[in-house]
Amino acid sequence: MNSLLITGTDTGAGKTIVTSALAAYWHKYYPSQRLGVIKLLQTGIGDHEHYQAMFAGQESVEVVCPLRFTTPVAPPIAAERENQPIPLEIVWKSLVSLQKSCDFVLAEGLGGLGSPVTWELTVADLAGEWRLPTVLVVPVKLGAIAQAVANVALARQTQVNLKGIILSCSHPLSPQELSDWAPMDLIQSLTGVPVLGVIPYLETIKDLDQLAKSASHLDLEPLISLDCRTQFLG
């Protein structure tokens, strides 16, 4: 499947930074390939507007957000307050449409893997039911190891096709802090999921070159299929 879901351990884990870095990387190195960026569902103002500004005027990048609520809280609560349904079929149709029209699609989830999408479903449920290849963003901080272990367990329970873990730094860190708080070998050993690298702290997420450079240090091979890599390189 020519798509990748970027989810995290929690709200503020670094999903938007990682999605932006991956999008900037593909836009820079594969400019002839069409890239789709979709925020599956948004409450309040934020990520969708960021991606629109980031790729304004770029015909090779399509940015969509099929379902939005004004209230910046969990979707089932926002929908209830606004007296609106949560028609996930609209989200699914938008995703499928992007998959058909683009060479690769980056889909950013909402909140964390366990965050509610409806009163019955979480992000993990959608990722599993929709069979989306998924990467888990784990913020580098005290408690990162436990968060990674718990979220990988949830991913397995809901049959998420988890391709790897990406660590994200929300503030400047020393090598010692990175090693102490999010040791890659230990996280891999406990979860059985490869840690694909670290996105360092970035002062801005509007610099496409800086974003692409940060993604270039990741092990990107597990995140796209052989067909997509052949297409990109062809």
UniProtKB/Swiss-Prot annotation:
The protein's enzyme class: ligase
Keywords noted in UniProt: ATP-binding, Biotin biosynthesis, Cytoplasm, Ligase, Magnesium, Metal-binding, Nucleotide-binding
A UniProt-annotated Pfam family: AAA_26
Location in the cell: Cytoplasm
Reactions it catalyzes: (7R,8S)-7,8-diammoniononanoate + CO2 + ATP = (4R,5S)-dethiobiotin + ADP + phosphate + 3 H(+); (7R,8S)-8-amino-7-(carboxyamino)nonanoate + ATP = (4R,5S)-dethiobiotin + ADP + phosphate + H(+)
Enzyme Commission number, as recorded: 6.3.3.3
Ranges in a coiled coil: none
InterPro entries: DTB_synth_BioD (IPR004472), P-loop_NTPase (IPR027417)
GO process terms (BP): biotin biosynthetic process
Molecular function as annotated in GO: ATP binding; dethiobiotin synthase activity; magnesium ion binding
Residues at which ATP binds: 12-17, 47, 108-111, 168-169, 200-202
Entry binding sites for substrate: T43
Cofactor(s) named in the record: Mg(2+)
Function summary: Catalyzes a mechanistically unusual reaction, the ATP-dependent insertion of CO2 between the N7 and N8 nitrogen atoms of 7,8-diaminopelargonic acid (DAPA, also called 7,8-diammoniononanoate) to form a ureido ring. This cyanobacterium does not encode bioA (which catalyzes the formation of the precursor for this reaction in the cannonical pathway), instead it encodes bioU, which replaces bioA and also performs the first half of the cannonical BioD reaction. Thus in this organism BioD has a different substrate.
Protein name (database record): ATP-dependent dethiobiotin synthetase BioD
Species, as recorded: Rippkaea orientalis (strain PCC 8801 / RF-1) (Cyanothece sp. (strain PCC 8801))
Chain's gene name: bioD
